[in-house]
């Protein structure tokens, strides 16, 4: 009898890359293949939010107190919020939507979750780049002060979105009502994400609590890269790294635990 071929680490990695790639294509076709407005919404949602913030800024006549470009302020906060919010929300339904694919030997529960989150992160990234490029081209906002620092902030928050999504998906699998509640909780968390304020403008006691929230550090870091020395920010990249590691470790452990009880349908 022939001995079973044991795949090496690199072979296993290549297989997983192909599996996730195939799942990504399936998600793209399923979500955007028949209805292109779904793809367009990636750009429409942050633009609408920017428009609302600009209108509020003008209505409150806040330009009398600050010379900050409000369009740049909005567009450097909301798309990042949209990335982690949507990635974690989409992770919740990833298993039920792909349960039939688990019959395939190489498709794992983790792959189905990662594919959905990667698609959301990629979509938010494309939206951020395109919108900023257009706004710079038409002269509504200036070029970023430090694009590399912005990129580092975005990558850190992308890993945060993955870790958060793994944890939320695991909780929702074990406690189904939480999956429905999480959508509402993300709206409650929006004002706390740092997308609509600078930590520097908060009272000192409130600043301490705000800086306990990892999303605030990500937004502050992203805006520090865009505005440069024009604004005062309080980000700590190492705090985001620590939070990411904790979320990823807990998330992977939780997914590994409940995956054993998932049966193909």
From Swiss-Prot:
Membrane topology: Multi-pass membrane protein
Subcellular location: Cell inner membrane
Protein origin, superkingdom: Bacteria
Domain called ABC transmembrane type-2: residue spans: 37-258
Transmembrane segments: 37-57, 67-84, 121-141, 148-168, 178-198, 238-258
Major location category of this protein: membrane
Keyword Transport: yes
Entry keyword set: Capsule biogenesis/degradation, Cell inner membrane, Cell membrane, Membrane, Polysaccharide transport, Sugar transport, Transmembrane, Transmembrane helix, Transport
Coiled-coil regions, chain positions: none
Cystine pairs: none
GO cellular component: ATP-binding cassette (ABC) transporter complex
Keyword Ligase listed: no
A molecular function (GO) term: ABC-type transporter activity
InterPro entries for this protein: ABC2_TM, ABC2_TM_bact-type, ABC_2_transport
Gene Ontology BP, a term: lipopolysaccharide transport
Function (record text): May form an ATP-driven capsule polysaccharide export apparatus, in association with the CtrB and CtrD proteins.
PANTHER family found in the cross-reference section: CAPSULE POLYSACCHARIDE EXPORT INNER-MEMBRANE PROTEIN CTRC (PTHR30413:SF10), INNER MEMBRANE TRANSPORT PERMEASE (PTHR30413)
Family of this protein: Belongs to the ABC-2 integral membrane protein family.
Stated name of the protein: Capsule polysaccharide export inner-membrane protein CtrC
Organism: Neisseria meningitidis serogroup B (strain ATCC BAA-335 / MC58)
């Amino acid at each position: 009898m022939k001995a079973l071929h044991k795949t090496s680490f690199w072979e296993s990695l290549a297989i997983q890359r192909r599996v996730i790639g195939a799942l990504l294509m399936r998600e793209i076709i399923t979500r955007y293949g028949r209805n292109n407005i779904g793809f367009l919404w990636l750009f429409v949602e942050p633009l609408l939010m920017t428009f609302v913030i600009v209108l509020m800024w003008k209505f409150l006549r806040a330009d009398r107190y600050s010379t900050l470009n409000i369009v740049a302020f909005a567009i450097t906060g909301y798309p990042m919020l949209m990335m982690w919010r949507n990635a974690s929300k989409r992770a919740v339904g990833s298993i039920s939507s792909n349960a039939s694919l688990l019959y395939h030997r190489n498709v794992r529960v983790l792959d189905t979750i990662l594919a959905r989150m990667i698609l959301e992160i990629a979509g938010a990234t494309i939206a951020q780049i395109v919108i900023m490029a257009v706004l710079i081209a038409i002269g509504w906002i200036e070029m970023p002060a430090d694009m590399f620092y912005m990129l580092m902030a975005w990558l850190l928050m992308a890993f945060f979105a993955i870790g958060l999504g793994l944890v939320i998906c695991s909780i929702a699998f074990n406690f189904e009502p939480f999956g429905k509640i999480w959508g509402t909780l993300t709206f409650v968390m929006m004002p706390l994400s740092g997308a609509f304020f600078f930590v520097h403008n908060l009272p000192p006691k409130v600043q301490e609590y705000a800086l306990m929230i990892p999303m605030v550090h990500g937004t502050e870091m992203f805006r520090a890269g865009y505005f440069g020395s024009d604004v005062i920010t309080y980000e700590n990249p190492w705090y985001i790294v620590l939070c990411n590691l904790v979320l990823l470790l807990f998330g992977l452990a939780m997914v590994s635990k409940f995956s054993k009880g998932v049966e193909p349908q």
